[in-house]
Design a protein with these regions (language model features):
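Hydrophobic alpha-helical bundle architecture
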Residues: 5-13, 196-280, 284
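Signature of multi-pass transmembrane helix bundles
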Residues: 1-195, 250-255, 288-358
Length: 358
């Protein structure tokens, strides 16, 4: 990160240490697949560099869409990995005649449907729906009414409380962001327009994120069951669903329909990515269990493990296979792509800094 700041190939200062595990994840999986720590570090570094560049690319739209996010970018590879997909799908949807009229956002739903459009009500509705779907027959639904209603209330509470909690996080982290930016500006003389890289957790409380995530939870489970060739059933991974959308919403401008369609497509494809990476993920988990005896990573015999976050990302899948499956040729391609993106980003940063100084 420091080298990229010095060479003006990024303007993001990444202090989101909590999410460094994403880079460690792809590096670890490559390490266990190749049995080489050097290949693992290579994959992690490539992932990190491209993530910082994507954070720069999305920063302006991110800051323009969300409130109180000036000077902040999101260098989290799980979020960033879906940006190219979102840009392409969003352009395709814009070209469909009449589709632009389906401009539905979370606030618009509130105005149009009143109580029915409130995130609280939608949470209750989706929670009760998931609870009912878990029952085998009508009699079981009747017997489990207290459980179903309880799940609905919990989902509704999540929809209502997460935005409020998120706003408290923003208030608490904003001074840290401002102080870090001032400190870095002093150390890097002439640096203009630096952004502080922070966790997407700051914005997962956006109503559109909550609405689309809750709608996609049952859809993703259904896709996992019906898609031919998929062998991954997401359970605990569903908690990571919220992190798909922080950088997609600025592209769709908060349109719930567009965001849902993009989420549907990327998650359907992502299930196949997880299935493909599962053997390598499982190998890594077995090694960890052998050394730590931690029951949390003990995958039973006859099963394979996977994770929606970060293994479903096209970003991690592409880096893994170019490094592992194609070795030197694939790695050469990754280096060329990364250098090309760094040069483009440097030109953009220099142009931006000249504009700011003038």
């Amino acid at each position: 990160n420091i080298l990229m700041l010095l060479t003006k190939t990024t303007r993001t200062v990444n202090i989101d240490l909590w999410n460094y595990w994403h880079f460690a994840f792809i590096g670890a999986v490559v390490y266990f697949a190749t049995d080489s720590i050097l290949w693992g570090f290579f994959a992690a570094v490539i992932c990190y560099i491209i993530t910082l560049i994507l954070a720069d690319y999305t920063a302006d739209k991110f800051q323009g869409f969300y409130d109180k996010m000036e000077g902040i970018s999101i260098p989290q590879p799980f979020c960033a990995g879906f940006v190219p997909f979102a840009l392409i799908i969003n352009k395709v949807l814009d070209k469909i005649p009449g589709f632009e009229k389906l401009n539905i956002d979370a606030e618009g739903m509130k105005k149009k449907f009143g109580l029915l459009g409130e995130p609280l009500f939608l949470g209750i509705l989706v929670g009760c729906g998931i609870g009912a779907l878990s029952c085998k027959n009508g009699q079981e639904i009747v017997d489990k009414i207290p459980y179903i209603l309880g799940l609905g209330i919990k989902m509704g509470a999540v929809m209502e409380l997460i935005p409020r909690i998120t706003s408290l996080f923003i208030e608490g982290l904003k001074p840290i962001s401002d102080a870090t930016r001032e400190l870095i500006a002093k150390k890097f003389k002439g640096a203009v327009g630096l952004n502080i890289g922070m966790s997407p957790a700051l914005v997962i409380g956006h109503p559109a994120t909550l609405v689309v995530s809750l709608l996609l939870i049952p859809v993703t489970i259904l896709l996992a069951v019906v898609l031919p060739g998929n062998e991954f059933l997401p359970l605990a991974s569903l908690a990571g669903m919220f992190y798909v959308f922080p950088l997609i919403l600025p592209i769709t401008k908060g349109n719930v329909v567009k965001t849902f369609i993009i989420g549907f497509v990327v998650l359907a494809i992502g299930l196949y990515f997880v299935t493909d990476l599962a053997p390598y993920f499982t190998k890594a988990a077995h090694d960890v269990y052998a050394k730590t005896q931690d029951a949390a990573v003990n995958i039973p015999s006859g099963f394979e493990g996977g994770a929606l976050d970060f293994a479903s990302s096209p970003f991690s899948w592409a880096i893994f296979h170019l490094t592992y499956s194609f070795k030197w040729i694939g790695s050469g391609i990754l280096v060329l792509i990364t250098l090309f993106l760094m040069v483009l980003n440097r030109r953009s940063i220099i142009k931006y800094q000249k504009t700011m100084k003038n």
